[in-house]
Amino acid sequence: MTPSPPPITYISIPLPTNDVVSRSIHNLTTAISSHRPWSELIFSGDFSLPESFSSLLLRSKTNFNYFFVNYTIIVSTCAAFALITASPVALIVVGAIIALWLIFHFFREDPLILWSFQVGDRTVLLFLVLASVWAIWFTNSAVNLAVGVSVGLLLCIIHAVFRNSDELFLEEDDAINGGLIGSNLR
């Protein structure tokens, strides 16, 4: 009887920081490019009151899954506008913090290497949280940011509730991931 081969393990190869940044920016642009056409968001489809609470929930869920990237852009734009009206410095500082979150947390695929040392995920997360708290405290923009995000969310919720979603067709994978249809895989 021959011994079984050792299990195969996959190890990611650490990349330099500038490669992590460029890959993160590429992932961000790929994510943003998946938005639905704005004309489809605004002009196509009819707007009406839902007939029941269950149809309201289904319509909202379908619209949120279908227009998720568009809604994210709307909320971000409202938050940015609120920060511009408060202080341009606040917009720059909070924008830099958001960029740090996108690059070093959400779109990073490989371990972060700084000065030949691998930085752990907890350390990166702690740094990002502390930087975010500092930025909001430094710019006194917590109220303005909350108002901007709230207005953006309100606009998206109103659109999701009143836009009739009967003619929207999601890709099968999007519908399964969004929980709109079940999967046969168990």
Curated annotation (Swiss-Prot):
Record protein name field: PRA1 family protein G2
Assigned protein family: Belongs to the PRA1 family.
Membrane-topology annotation of the record: Multi-pass membrane protein
Its job: May be involved in both secretory and endocytic intracellular trafficking in the endosomal/prevacuolar compartments.
Any Pfam family hit: PRA1
One CC-aspect GO term: endoplasmic reticulum membrane
Alphabetical UniProt keywords: Endoplasmic reticulum, Membrane, Transmembrane, Transmembrane helix, Transport
Tissue distribution: Expressed in roots and trichomes.
Organism this protein belongs to: Arabidopsis thaliana (Mouse-ear cress)
Ranges annotated as spanning the membrane: 66-86, 87-107, 119-139, 142-162
InterPro entries membership: Prenylated_rab_accept_PRA1
Main location: endoplasmic reticulum
Gene: PRA1G2
GO terms classed as biological process: vesicle-mediated transport
Subcellular location(s) per record: Endoplasmic reticulum membrane
